[in-house]
Amino acid sequence: MDCKVVSLNEKDQFIPKIKSSDPVITGLFQYDAAQQTSFEKRMSKENNGREAALANVIREYMSDLKLSSEQELNIQHLANGSKVVIGGQQAGLFGGPLYIFHKIFSIITLSKELTDTHKQQVVPVFWIAGEDHDFDEVNHTFVYNENHGSLHKVKYHTMEMPETTISRYYPDKAELKQTLKTMFIHMKETVHTQGLLEICDRIIDQYDSWTDMFKALLHETFKAYGVLFIDAQFEPLRKMEAPMFKKILKKHQLLDDAFRATQQRTQNQGLKAMIQTDTNVHLFLHDENMRQLVSYDGKHFKLNKTDKTYVKEEIINIAENQPELFSNNVVTRPLMEEWLFNTVAFIGGPSEIKYWAELKDVFELFDVEMPIVMPRLRITYLNDRIEKILSKYNIPLEKVLVDGVEGERSKFIRELASHQFIEKVEGMIEQQRRLNQDLLDEVAGNQNNINLVNKNNEIHIQQYDYLLKRYLLNIERENDISMKQFREIQETLHPMGGLQERIWNPLQILNDFGTDVFKPSTYPPLSYTFDHIIIKP
């Protein structure tokens, strides 16, 4: 597999500014992610004393998996005080989208580089956000149909949308297998298809909860790298978190004030507010099989779906004795994660790291230091067919990754068109606009006639526009093979107006290039970069 790094002219300059140590951006975080001294400081930080208990919890969580020797060793390293590189994500259908795998590769790559540089073991940890309840975000994925040159949405359907946390959701296995079958119908048959389908079927048969199936697929893929997994909703982990839940409840107003102040500061720097929440407690409570947002009205803590209320002593008592009923929101999850782990760096996506920029004062309030916040690696897979099509039409890969292919497609069509025809139609449009202005001058002051002239002009312009569009459409239809190839480029490299990794599913790559494509023996060794990585399997 070939691997190269390209620099893109990104529309969003947040990550390039992190790369260049822009003082406005670095001032939003505790550490400058582009400076080696930041890593030296984090590597030398004193541990919090929770590492042995945390290692036991992770071992228990992964007890339904057959651990690799690398994972066994990393659990031991964690118990002995090794620091971690961590990142997480919701449990997407069939492991998707691709950027989840890329986030794990980011964690693996950075932890290895730190281990090699500092001669201290750094453990890769992936945090499954099983406490989330927005099932609409994880119940679907996309598959690319090569025959049609188009993407198709594949969705797991359920009669009732679960309102509990994703970790508490148990999908219908028959329906899930039907969803899997639908996905594979769209994918081309390869020598890897049957083996991959058997792996997925076995996972569905062997595991029951949505997040356990997700965990099993990730484990199958990344166990050889020694990656450790933990679900935020795992009950033994929640019991460890009880002291912090109590602190959050006691300081909820100060926490909310700190968050709002930091968010306002980021907006004053010209950034858009990322975290949208009305709560002033920033916790959820599981009640009546629903994950309910907690808010405080000045006298009581109130649940948003059942309107159940608690006085402070009651809700703190729940946190102490039944912490598994609580879960964090986007504000408190990073805080809880860092309170638990001895983290060198947190790996986040482009939007995620902007969330963290709004939390600096929250960390300081609880005397928890924000770790180095690193943008994850961004990766695109380029196969031989798409590379040949790009070459055929002389289209730069970097341009497609940023802007898509529509501009190049339009340019191609116009080059095939009669320039005289287009010029004459455009000339007629310009002539009509001049005529319209002359007529308006003639009827100035008479609103009825002004309306009549403008309406007449609108009809003429629409007719000329229609003529030009239909003429170009006819050229498209006469060149349907080329149009399909442009569509292939778009759906492969810039699907739905964004990067491939945000839409494509990992099963597509596994099916095309083999079930071992992500394994250490096959996948190219990566170096951490803020730029874009192109991999040619």
Curated annotation (Swiss-Prot):
It holds the Pfam family Rossmann-like_BshC. Its EC number is 6.-.-.-. Signal peptide: none annotated. One of its GO terms (molecular function) is ligase activity. Residues 422-450 form a coiled coil. Involved in bacillithiol (BSH) biosynthesis. May catalyze the last step of the pathway, the addition of cysteine to glucosamine malate (GlcN-Mal) to generate BSH. Belongs to the BshC family. HAMAP family: BshC. This is Putative cysteine ligase BshC. It comes from Staphylococcus aureus (strain bovine RF122 / ET3-1).
